[in-house]
């Protein structure tokens, strides 16, 4: 149905583009279906950004680029069924599913030109909303980090942090990073790498997977002063970071999906944070399976 179509689309489409595949069904979908829609978006990445990630991690080495591309594609494909499993465990389908949905020609368009017009209009409205929500969430994260920095500066913590960690100051990323270090141990990461892996997950959640992959590119370089000890950790990190699950994405999805189904905006805000958690669990599940196979 519409759920499987959206999840399948999320493998290579973005978290705001995939919902366009099921635009005509959005107003009739229930809470469990919306949760899967959002989780699928959080657990995967858009094909348009895969090239950037390959560039970050593969550098100028064509063989390394191929290996990174394989890992990223594997992560995206694994995330689709994982999103279904995790989302239905967190929000089981208890409501009646409407299987008799009629889609008006106003939604799909009466002809080719009408469909192009509708798609262009929806795309522009979505882009504006997504841009606004992303700007607000990134600004909020910057505000929190600014407050943390000033507090740490009073107690002289920033200098100590700069000398002893990969961070320059006390921040939300640092807190989340060390908070998730025990979780990295639970999914099978080597003890030597759990702190760095936890920091990568923290950066992904607080900032974005883009920033986390840039940091991973540095941490995978054995010539760096601070780097991951094992190649297995590098591969697991590549899989774990392959998803849009972060705080900014909550706003992106609320803005993107909300413009397509204005009546569901309240529901989107209610389940947005939980969808981010679910998307993170999907990525961790994929990384765990890959770690088991690597031994």
Describe the function of each predicted region:
Residues 111-128, 149-156, 167, 261-273:
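Hydrophobic, small-residue-rich membrane helices and short re-entrant helix-turn-helix hairpins
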Residues 1-57, 112, 198-277, 281-285, ...:
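Alpha-helical membrane segments and immediately flanking helix-loop junctions
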Residues 43-55, 75-91, 133-146, 180-183, ...:
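Hydrophobic core segments of alpha-helical transmembrane domains in multi-pass membrane transport
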Residues 77-126:
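Long, contiguous bundles of hydrophobic transmembrane helices that form the permeation core
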Residues 29-39, 49-52, 56-97:
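Conserved, well-structured core segments that form the ligand-binding/active-site neighborhood
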Residues 41, 72-85, 157-181, 273-281:
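Small-residue-enriched core segments of transmembrane alpha-helices in multipass membrane transport
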Residues 26-29, 54-68, 106, 152-169, ...:
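Inter-helical loop and helix-membrane interface segments of multi-pass membrane transporters/permeases
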Residues 124-221:
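Transmembrane helical segments that form the transport core of multi-pass membrane transport proteins
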